[in-house]
From Swiss-Prot:
It comes from Shewanella pealeana (strain ATCC 700345 / ANG-SQ1). This is Aminomethyltransferase. The gene is gcvT. Its EC number is 2.1.2.10. It catalyses: N(6)-[(R)-S(8)-aminomethyldihydrolipoyl]-L-lysyl-[protein] + (6S)-5,6,7,8-tetrahydrofolate = N(6)-[(R)-dihydrolipoyl]-L-lysyl-[protein] + (6R)-5,10-methylene-5,6,7,8-tetrahydrofolate + NH4(+). InterPro entries: GCS_T (IPR006223), GCS_T_bac (IPR022903), GCST_C (IPR013977), GCV_T_N (IPR006222), GcvT/YgfZ/DmdA (IPR028896), GcvT/YgfZ_C (IPR029043), TrmE/GcvT_dom1 (IPR027266).
Amino acid sequence: MANKTVLFNKHLESNGKMVDFHGWDMPLNYGSQIEEHHAVRQDAGMFDVSHMTVVDVIGDDACAFLRKLLANDVAKLKVPGKALYGGMLDHNGGVIDDLITYYLSDTEYRIVVNSATREKDLAWINEQVKGFSVEVTERPELAMIAVQGPNAKAKAATVFNDAQNAAIEGMKPFFGVQAGSLFIATTGYTGETGYEVIVPNDEAEALWQAFLDAGIKPCGLGARDTLRLEAGMNLYGLDMDESVNPLAANMGWTVAWEPAERDFNGRQALEKIKAEGTDKLVGLIMDAKGVIRHGMSVFFTDSDGVEQQGTITSGTFSPTLGYSIAMARVPRSIGDVAEVEMRKKRVPVKVIAPSFVRNGKQAF
């Protein structure tokens, strides 16, 4: 029996095409994935992300615990509401999950983890918390709606009350604030501005309807995937997993090496990997017709004239750019051209940093 979010009936009302997503009944689209994609790039769209897992970490040792648990350093967070992105690593340096952590106070943090990894994540967190004076509390009574796009904030402002609008006025990216019953954060998974709003289950349908009435278009998993890939954002399970270290997943910037004495999980293994060198995650763009897909092979010749091979982790047709884009894990020696094997032929591709579209515009 698939799990249903509290917004399931709202998806049916909007003719959502429901599919199984890691055990959850979620909308793939509401008629046109392309229209939903363009709505977020050009206007405003919203996503039900209530399948994500909200976990509160509270106690005297909350900071110390998260500094051990995460490769990024929550001690950098000094202003209440400030958030950071990073990986939760195993002892081999593999990525158990990528997540966002909000600093609420020195003894209170909120983390949001992926739905596909929920059970594994919670088991790992509860194992690691032993010995720390910390309470780890999952919050299944909370739903989450992401409102994204250039007009998302203005349209959402017509839904929020005066006190909520005052609380979020001028809020920088990667912040969250509790405003009335809503936790409103300037985060997202699209490369556009907007909010992720955590809302009590019993208020979620009314909030969704209010956003609909404000002219915010409902968007499904299909558009969510093309948007995040255009933005160069990783999808756990495709672009990285426990077999992949963060340095090979374009997450090196999220590893806080200083202070050197902070012994986060996986640090020793990761230091060894860093010293020896590892593969890297790159972006690919293809002018030719066709679509690059997950699992295809990438070939290039290195500066020594030796052929090297990598693998496509995520690929799609980019509705914004009008051609195929992809992310690929490849040996570090790659230059700025390569070939992808498609239908037994090799097709030339350009190699770029893995970021294609930000704020509605080409990012390279």
